Amino acid sequence: MAYKPQFYPGNTLIAENRRKHMNPEVELKKLRDIPDDEIVKILGHRNPGESYKTVHPPLEEMDFEEDPIKDIVEPIQGAKEGVRVRYIQFADSMYNAPAQPYDRARTYMWRFRGIDTGTLSGRQVIEMRELDLEKISKNFLIDTEFFDPATCGIRGATVHGHSLRLDENGLMFDGLQRYIYDEKTGHVLYVKDQVGRPLDEPVDVGEPLPHDYLAKITTIYRKDNIGMREDKEALEVVQIIHEARTKGGFGLEVFKKDLKKRLGEE
């Protein structure tokens, strides 16, 4: 029997937005078109036009011992070419940003191959072969509605600000001020790369999304938008997981009675 993934429980718009992010068959709306070289500048791992640094020869030139995995798993392009691993990291405002750390983790795992990701309270990192990282950074992480220039920050270090109030232009606080609001154009400009090194020229990532639009596409439950208590199914699943994890922490012995009951032994 084929398994059809449900991705996420719930009947609210928030739950549906989470399912859209995770489902690789759903193509998110493209909102901007940042040039490839501009993406490279923000990432800060290499200069535009510079060759990719490698850590091993191309796979086809390597003499592997017998390894069944290499015949089962198709390597991503960067792995084929021996390109090094690099990262991009985002901080998401709790004020209706399109994504948030756990949503990013689940989305990355569903949509991308050859990645590693780490979840923290206010930021989410994704590591990948540099060649492939640049492609997904442009085509999904930045160009689509997964990203908002005001409430999502590309921050490789000093990420604080996700829980602070937005400024008068709707921008999330950034201690390194990697980006600024251009009052003439109404666009957000990155003046530093993701770790805070000044750029020779600003990178325009477009205008902030309207607050009412963010409220419709966000994956964050909020009392002043859609609260989690409004989503009965999602709340039930969370409670089931919480109870199982809590009881499981005391050992499987606590499940013995329940298991016997399910097996019809009592």
From Swiss-Prot:
Function: Component of the methyl-coenzyme M reductase (MCR) I that catalyzes the reductive cleavage of methyl-coenzyme M (CoM-S-CH3 or 2-(methylthio)ethanesulfonate) using coenzyme B (CoB or 7-mercaptoheptanoylthreonine phosphate) as reductant which results in the production of methane and the mixed heterodisulfide of CoB and CoM (CoM-S-S-CoB). This is the final step in methanogenesis.
Family: Belongs to the methyl-coenzyme M reductase gamma subunit family.
BP-aspect Gene Ontology terms: methanogenesis
Positions with a binding annotation for coenzyme M: R123
Cofactor(s) demanded: coenzyme F430
Pathway field: One-carbon metabolism; methyl-coenzyme M reduction; methane from methyl-coenzyme M: step 1/1
Cofactor note: Binds 2 coenzyme F430 non-covalently per MCR complex. Coenzyme F430 is a yellow nickel porphinoid. Methyl-coenzyme-M reductase is activated when the enzyme-bound coenzyme F430 is reduced to the Ni(I) oxidation state.
Superkingdom classification of source: Archaea
Main enzyme class: transferase
A Pfam cross-reference name: MCR_gamma
Native organism: Methanocaldococcus jannaschii (strain ATCC 43067 / DSM 2661 / JAL-1 / JCM 10045 / NBRC 100440)
InterPro entries xrefs: Me_CoM_Rdtase_Fd-like_fold (IPR009024), Me_CoM_Rdtase_gsu (IPR003178), Me_CoM_Rdtase_gsu_sf (IPR036994)
UniProt xrefs under CDD domains: MCR_gamma
Catalytic activity of the protein: coenzyme B + methyl-coenzyme M = methane + coenzyme M-coenzyme B heterodisulfide
The entry's keywords: Methanogenesis, Transferase
Protein name per Swiss-Prot or TrEMBL: Methyl-coenzyme M reductase II subunit gamma
Record's subunit section: MCR is a hexamer of two alpha, two beta, and two gamma chains, forming a dimer of heterotrimers.
MF terms (GO), sorted A to Z: coenzyme-B sulfoethylthiotransferase activity
EC number: 2.8.4.1
